[in-house]
């Protein structure tokens, strides 16, 4: 039996909150992907919880996103909604906040960047990107992975 939440005001928005409300351990939560409708694996449930993404509701049922759809729709989002890129110092002056106080997600896997990852952008002179009204960069895992991928050539 899947959990159903009729009242939008009472809907848990995070996996941790859903786990508490249903009194089910995180490992036993069974959720479907909002895009492909496949059931998430345990690893995907944990990954979703670690990225601090919010649950979405369709017909009063909670949905998350699987890894394949997350990577695919993150790329679509990047291409459709990219606005501009800035260096860390410029981002701080634009927002009037320090980088450590800003929520900056990885543009690829959507995990929140740690203070160390934000500092690495500054040290390596890598830019942050405004995509769909949110600031993004690269987490260390995606940074390493994309540095191994062949670059697109321009002809």
Curated annotation (Swiss-Prot):
**Molecular function via GO:** DNA binding; zinc ion binding
Q: Where in the cell is it found?
A: Host cytoplasm; Host nucleus
BP GO annotations: DNA-templated transcription; regulation of DNA-templated transcription; symbiont-mediated perturbation of host apoptosis; symbiont-mediated perturbation of host ubiquitin-like protein modification; symbiont-mediated suppression of host innate immune response; symbiont-mediated suppression of host type I interferon-mediated signaling pathway
**Any one GO CC term of the record:** host cell cytoplasm
What Pfam families is this protein classified in? Answer: E6
Q: Note the zinc finger regions (unnamed) by start and end residue.
A: 33-69, 106-142
| Family assignment from sequence similarity | Belongs to the papillomaviridae E6 protein family.
Q: What else is known?
A: Belongs to the low risk human alphapapillomavirus family. The cancer-causing human papillomavirus E6 protein has a unique carboxy terminal PDZ domain containing substrate but low risk E6s do not possess this domain.
- Assembly with partners or alone: Forms homodimers. Interacts with ubiquitin-protein ligase UBE3A/E6-AP; this interaction stimulates UBE3A ubiquitin activity. Interacts with host TP53 and EP300; this interaction inhibits TP53 activity.
Explain the purpose of this protein: This protein has transforming activity in vitro.
Q: What is this protein called?
A: Protein E6
Which organism is this entry from?
Human papillomavirus 56
